[in-house]
Amino acid sequence: MADESNKVAAEVRDSFGKGAARKIRAAGKIPAVIYGHGSEPVHITLPAHQVGLLLRKANAVLDIDIAGKTQLALVKDVQKDPVLQIIEHLDLLVVRRGEKVQVEVPVHVEGEPFSGTIAMLDIPTIKLEVEATNIPERIVIDVTGAEEGTQYHAKDFALPAGAVLAEDEDLLLLNIIVPAAARAEDEEAVVEAAGDQAAE
């Protein structure tokens, strides 16, 4: 959700190319482009440290101030250096309050399944259609006490108010399984027990 803490002052940039981008990043800024709602793309720079903190939250919505004019923008794409993990460029989509957008929301697993089993997350995110200024940080799946073979599908949990599932409702998100190593140990124990009985 956009609020006072999401306000970011941007500067319009007119220099492009790899050399210009390096200079921008060396100055503690991030090159970005903001577009949407039929407007021409605007190339800007943003303060790297402030934006880096805001991007700790998935699907961040920023309140961008460009020469005194503010626009809400959803972070659509983050390009990072694959080694240093430094943000190299951002794509920002202009949104309006009350507007619905489709976003990938992280799936978070809580609780401990039945002893000897583990929760295997098949899909790390789920696509929802939500208001741009009311995007949930995550969807929680509670697996407390769940037994082997239990499956969780997209339709199996309540969505936040105002959110609509934008996936196949039968999409498999998570499985409760017995780890292969543990299963092999159990099978080996059964074989040994059978051998002991046969020897008696």
Curated annotation (Swiss-Prot):
GO terms for molecular function: 5S rRNA binding; structural constituent of ribosome. The keyword Glycoprotein does not apply. The keyword rRNA-binding applies. It comes from the Bacteria. Keywords: Ribonucleoprotein, Ribosomal protein, RNA-binding, rRNA-binding. Pfam families: Ribosomal_L25p, Ribosomal_TL5_C. SUPFAM superfamilies: Ribosomal protein L25-like. GO terms for biological process: translation. GO terms for cellular component: cytosolic large ribosomal subunit. Part of the 50S ribosomal subunit; part of the 5S rRNA/L5/L18/L25 subcomplex. Contacts the 5S rRNA. Binds to the 5S rRNA independently of L5 and L18. Belongs to the bacterial ribosomal protein bL25 family. CTC subfamily. This is one of the proteins that binds to the 5S RNA in the ribosome where it forms part of the central protuberance. This is Large ribosomal subunit protein bL25. It comes from Leifsonia xyli subsp. xyli (strain CTCB07). The gene is rplY.
